[in-house]
Amino acid sequence: MILREACEFVKDGTHGSYKNVDNGYPLLSAKDINNGVLTIPTNSRKISKIDFDDIYKNYKIKSGDVLITIVGSVGRTAIVRDFIDVAFQRSVGILRPNNKVTSSFLFYILQTTQQQKQLMSKISKSAQGGVYLGELNKIVIPIPPLEEQQRIVSILDRFDRITNDLTAGLPAEIEKRRQQYEYYRDKLLTFKRKGA
């Protein structure tokens, strides 16, 4: 199935230029999507309510939308977990899955080597390479039945939790092993003096 058939819509962020304001709505870009997470920096560029409303007059970002970077570092993904009032620049694609695919499955499938290769093959040869929406829509993705998608997502979510737990716990584990090494090293290299 092509991506367009699995989504209610496939859009990208704004192509317009907007005046920066001190207090307003964050205008985010591809640099704000890393390791499956959308980050909203406190010092992010802000736009006015009028500009924000103009960008999203036809739709709003909502929980469950899948974001994909399509300019610069192409192919990084994140799921919008909570309703947020942010706008995106053209470097971010916004995918709203339809009833044939879950957000989590789409998030994971777009990270696979096969889908990443497809994305890379669609990059335009411009100054800052990117994937146009017409090409993004044509990405072929395997879509199993919903029950199978949920089973796959459940397994991948568990692996993700384990990986993140390991990453978070790794420095402490390394420190424990270093202390253990020092203890046994000292034990092995401490000799009783003759006559003592």
Segments (PLM) and residue ranges:
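A short glycine-rich beta-alpha junction/loop motif
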Residues: 86-93, 124-145
